[in-house]
Amino acid sequence: MDNKNLELIKLNKHISYITSTDVPLSANVVLVNGNDHVWMFDVGNHPDIQEIVNEFNRGGKKINAVLSHFHQDHIGNIQKFKFDKVHQGRLTFKHTGIGDIIESDIYIDDGDIRLHIFPLPSSHSKGSLAMEADETYCFLGDGIYAMEKSGEKVYNAGLLKEEINVLNTVKADNFCLSHREPFITPKEIVIRHLEKIYGRRSKNEAYIKDC
């Protein structure tokens, strides 16, 4: 196995994450060790992720997945695992063809772990999901990033406002962003950044350039 570009980093006794890579492009993968299941937030696209997950899950627990959105770097390994359940948005389901569609907030208790899975309005990808763990960490995938439109990175102004409103209700103080180092950014900094972008909107313009 060549996983020299991958690291498994521990956040606390229950939660770890696998670092992202550029070649192949692969998102961060979050691993939550519940009482009955191991939970994966995104499954990545790097071929060595499966072996790292197997090592993490030495007890052989069933595995559930929560997919942030449908881009390949987040779901590329979906067929490499035998999941008990897969939670995703409607557009992601069109790409995976397996699991459940989540369109409203759900709360799950798995031993000492409490998960909050919820739809996240996002310019980057419609139908995104986020996952909050123990009101401590909130995993956002690429949810706060811009989208590509006519060769420019832009935000949909309406979706951005909705996203800010949703993120303000999250109790966790630590927001975790894929492809970003450090992985953790304080909630207040993320929201301040998004509010600054929203503040640049022009009247009657649907999109805001990401400068």
Across the structure, where does each feature detected by a protein language model lie?
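A generic local structural motif
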Residues: 3-4, 25-28, 50-55, 71-75, ...
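Short glycine/proline-enriched coil/turn segments at helix->beta-strand junctions
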Residues: 35-36, 58-62, 79-85, 133-136, ...
